[in-house]
Amino acid sequence: MAKNPNNLIIRHQDEVAKERSACGHRYRLLSQGDNDVAAWAHAVDIDGAKTHYHKISTELYYVLEGEGKVLLDGEEQEVRPGTMVHIPPGVVHGAVGKMRVLVVGIPDID
């Protein structure tokens, strides 16, 4: 990871541990541990994400690889590479299928 006095962060997924999460396996590319960061970003290998919601965080999913469906308040939506999904606070969401997704949360996860 490269970090400088201006709080610029450059990080490759090989520099962070692969972790199990409710959505599959994730790589925390940007998260709470980074000073002065107002959001988080994870590369997630989704393999059946359990439904959940966030009280104050908005999430953005950008599908990088694979195909599947996201569940948004009980409604299924098909997604494929190039699809962006905006998930406002309070929306119960999850995913089915095998896909790699860039997930960004604003503000940091609650």
Label the model's feature ranges.
Residues 16-51, 104-109:
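A short glycine-rich, His/Asp/Glu-containing loop-to-beta-strand
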Residues 50-56, 91:
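Histidine-centered catalytic micro-motifs
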Residues 22, 34-36, 55, 79, ...:
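A generic fold-level signal
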Residues 2-20:
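Catalytic-core "active-site belt" of small-molecule-metabolizing enzymes
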Residues 43-45, 54-70:
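Short, conserved beta-strand element in jelly-roll/cupin
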Residues 60, 67-69, 76, 92, ...:
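Structural motif
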Residues 89-110:
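Ligand-binding loop in jelly-roll beta-barrel domains
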Residues 74-89:
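Short acidic-glycine-tyrosine-enriched beta hairpin
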